[in-house]
């Protein structure tokens, strides 16, 4: 998947925060008749995750093949081990991604669920209550975590199913030749049918054929931007190519706005702040979202290109971890997402370039040190790919 493969014949519905997402995923799991694949970074131990777990167990009890992938770091060593045992007892197959870093540094940061090859859900939401902080602190949030996912029906589902089943096979113990044959057969089975209005593409990042696919999707869209680009992310620390693409768009007269989550990790906030002066110098607007945890990884460009997914705009997501985004070319969908983004901007705090320039000298030094440390760590983790 080295370039975007837009598939026609889809209905893509935007889901906002946990209220929309968990209601939809639970109802779809209860409708499952054949098989369910679920991949997530965090599968927490709380009331919301218990509901999902119970629904998966019920599905297995009625004969549905249920397969779950959880990340070893995101879910935790002890809890993921407990999940594997409890799921196995209930007839659910569960695999942990990259325990003890046996496959290198990469984590699966993807959030994908495919049910009966009929519907798929892809986005930024983990299996965790969205009123509980996702950093392990147990902090109760005043407002639900701000995040998005999409519910997909149509031809693209076959391609998403191919991706998650291939991931499952990669984590198995079968020999390389058998695995290759199964994956090849799956790829041949993913076909498109009748064209409909809504076009969408699955864009993944891995450390095989798709090392820069998500970044290239953003660079291409920003390169074609004419009027407006709104991008939201909890962590902003992209490489030089991404930053230059934002600046180039702004220099062409594109109205570029970044909606950035702050307040969760002080080091990450400092790294993000280190980029502000150059962005301000080219007219890019920055809004910090502080109402609750911003976890959304979404963007809209020119009211016709939109993306929702798991990939942050930082070194780990763009250069190390496994990620999954959906890109949609549809004005109605883009406008719906724009409405939410404009609401987030209205609720956020616009950073004034003049006020920022008047910050104390020691803060600016701290931002520079934070970036120097972050850049060094990312260059090691990415073998020099992060610039």
PLM features: what roles do these ranges have?
Residues 1-387:
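Charged, low-complexity intrinsically disordered terminal segments
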